[in-house]
Amino acid sequence: MKEGDIAIASLRQADGTIKDRPVLLLRRMPPFQDFLVCGISTQLQQSAPELDETITPNDPDFRTSGLKAPSLIRIGFLAVLPRSHFRGRIGAISSVRLDRLMSRLSEFLRPKKV
């Protein structure tokens, strides 16, 4: 698996339960080859427009994503997961979308000037 892939992984939810969910692999983390991931959800109404991005069947990379329904790529729902938490790869997003999401995350994490 590599950055930009969408995989199924065991991910802790806000209520503390662990569920197998689609995740986007954002960055491989040294030294143990864990991955920084963000969750993917079909709950479009939970969108945080300054962070999240919707992917729909009208998007050129939807088919290659492996997702089955319009979904939110939730940049604000981050986790670092070991390889053992992944059940397998289902697809990938375009490099253009990955770059845009990484820029959005980087900008969000940058200190705000007061």
Model features per residue range: what roles?
Residues 1-114:
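Conserved functional hotspots at enzyme active or ligand-binding sites that engage polyanionic ligands
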